Amino acid sequence: MRLNKIILSFVSALVILFSTSVASFAKVVGDKIILGAAISLTGKYSSNGVHTQNGYNMAVDRINSMGGVKVGGKTYKFDIIYYDDESNPKRAAQLAERLISQDGVEFMLGPYSSGLTKAIAPVTEKYGVPMVEANGASRSLFTKGYKYLFAVLAPANLYLDVAIETAVELNGGKPVRIAQAFEQDAFSQDVRLGILDAAERTGSKIIIDDKLPKELNDMAATLVKVKQMKPDVLVVSGHTKGALTAIRQIAEMKVDVPMLAMTHCDAAKLSKQHGKNSQYALCASQWHKSLTYKDDFFIKKSSL
């Protein structure tokens, strides 16, 4: 399972949130508390949105199978109202308004991506509706004083900084030369800031600092410079499409770089889609299969 670590935190967050809340303030149908979520089922983030929906459904299934949550001496289970935000921030904010003001939802689940989370957070704050989110990692989300935003993942600036530290360690403790290319979104720019911090901390040097094209379908210009300047590390963050483009073009252009560090390898299913070409890429992840946690629920779900 890709999401087990995040989902465990998500389950815990929901249980804590509801066990300390009053059910009369929630939308309740029978014995079910209704949650709301605007998710990217179409558009740029559709594959990640489906993963997010699957994760939320899995968490709710687990909570319900364990008997639900007790609030004020009464037991409740969960159900979720979903709308497709079309990977569009404006649409996401509109749907958050609809879920709260029309559907009566009093507890929200976050969308996919920092940008869409940023679009929805002001809406949930305005109405005082708690939102638990697992996919908005931009640290700027957590510097605005939001009182109703609860996240269960590491901030974006910590995703790949360890790659620079590892490269320095493998280089005998000496500084390294870094090439980097990033999408122009809140998440990727925070990943970039983490690399800049790591470079300063280790005395390393950024020799290529590029922007990925908006379509995320061609990074040849960056890779030409990588071949010419021969950095010790190449860092790429462009969500799922950017990861796929990077692996494909690195192979096509026969780029040889000692270390490649990227985000969204799991979501892009790199090992399945690109096989040996994706080997040895260092990838940011909220969990890893080598972690020892397991139980019957995750074993059964991961085998489906």
Task: Provide a role label for each language-model segment.
Residues 1-34:
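Short, low-complexity disordered leader/linker segments with a strong preference
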Residues 41, 147-211, 233:
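An alpha-beta-alpha
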